[in-house]
Amino acid sequence: MAGRAVRESIQGQPFNDVLNELHAHTFSGSPGESDPFTLAELEREYIAYALALYYQCDHCQVYHGKVIDRLRAAAALADWPWRGEVLKTVLYLRTSKGSVSAPEWAGWQESWRRFAGRIHHRHPGLACAVAYAVGISRADETLMDMAFESLRDRFPDPATLLGVVRDIDRVVVFMKAATSKNRTDPILRRQLGTCGVRV
């Protein structure tokens, strides 16, 4: 019986083991090791999906999209075109204060608040959490401050707020690593292949 070929990792198995452990600490938890989560798994997965769109990682979009579909089905949630809404959220967040004039920024903020409020009625706090994640991912202090105000209003208890910020930050850190790896591995394999190296 022929065995199935297993593709060797470019980074090596120990690195992949660390990345898998980081995934567990970010999404499912590692019993006895992970801090408890404040945001629900579905919320963390929505943030991951948004970052997959933001970083343009097709693999991550497929993976986290399937997880969201599974979690939504398990919770028997009402139909909602969440993919389109998360996509619109990411498109909104591609604008930064430094790239537009002061009147444009004021108009953007007003429009964003209306849009985020509409999303809030379907999934409370989602647009704000995604905005905070995108702000962290590009070190956009203005966006982070704006989103943090909303987070602080939604989670007035300092310990809960800290948990929310930790959960969002962990998703950002994981997704930065995972999307980079998933987007560049095919390029690295192609380049190494030109030298006869197969991984």
Where are each of the predicted segments found?
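Hydrophobic alpha-helical segments
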Residues: 1-199
